[in-house]
Amino acid sequence: MKKDIVLCGVGGDGIVSVAKIISDAALSLGLNVKQSEIHGMSQRGGSVFSHLRIGSDPIAADVIPQGKADIILSSEPMEALRYLPFLSADGWVITNSAPFVNIKNYPNIEDVMAELKKLPHCVAFDANDVAKKVNARSNMVLLGAAANYLDIDFKHLEDSITRIFSRKGEAVVNSNIAAIRAGKEAK
């Protein structure tokens, strides 16, 4: 098993938390994990991305070469476009279709989505809307949408959420699990 995943978005969207959950689930299965993350501006709105490599064999480097990512998981559509050079020819993009407009010259969202829809494997939906319906965060909804492409049993993702968020209380754990379940059904 080998998965190279680029997670991207903007500061405050919970991309680092999603990477932590996937890493924890993979480690619980005895898989090897390498991760590299870059935090943009320390305030909400700066670009954030993480390279996450998972495999049954040892992993030498934590950075995914361009053209080799199996998945790009993005909390923001323009950020998904920014990291497309990393996507393999048969890779999947899973992205929130709702933009985070934090710059004056943000491109027309219809143009951004049209570019993403040209990809052979793209799941794009309004994760913010799904999250509101279950009173949760969109990052967890996106994790649920990506679950079918991770080659990690869904139960292991739920168990990782329980381990990671249990100190925040049962309500937070239940909210996050409800969100990944809603994301798995969304598309």
Which residue ranges define each predicted feature?
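Active-site cofactor/cluster-binding pocket
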Residues: 1-187
